[in-house]
Amino acid sequence: MTRRLTRLLSLATCAAALVLSSLPAQAMELEDYATYQPQTGCSPSAKPGTKMLGRWIVNRFDGGFGPISRPCSAGGTSEHKEGRAFDWTLDAATSRDRQRAAALLERLFRVRADGEAHVLARRMGIMYIIWNDHMYSAYNRFEKVDYLSSSCRSRRSCSKTLRHRNHMHISLTRRAGRANTSWYVARLAS
């Protein structure tokens, strides 16, 4: 009797997992806003979720597929050193790239009919975005705030790269880097 019950429970668990993984992301529970998860180790190989996100952005919005990884020997703390940050190559000096960036941000931060905000960004496990002297962080509900790199005294003395004017930086949670949030699970299942 116990063996039969164990088999039934195992079968039910497998069936539930298959059903959940085949649901579109919209049918899965919406993730909460990501908390800040800074780099704590160094494993710079590009994580599957980071690669998926980068390809999705470039395929849908154009622009260039910039770096994901950064060497462990590079200074400072960076999610690039854990393979969970993507730099989307754009130029803030061109209206075309500013429009591309605005289109992505609008899509990521769109409000659902039921009032839930930032749905796609939350499903993708985005921790924060830095672009064109501004930062949008999940832990501040993606509110647009001025950004100045700690390596710069002023914007005038700061390079385009440190100001994130030649790329959009997108950092992911560890789960998202592993492609283990609802957006990735739904895409992998289809």
Residue ranges and their predicted role:
Residues 1-27:
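Secretory targeting and sorting signals
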Residues 28-137, 171-172:
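Secreted/periplasmic proteins that engage bacterial cell-wall peptidoglycan
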Residues 104-190:
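Catalytic cores and adjacent binding grooves of peptidoglycan-active enzymes
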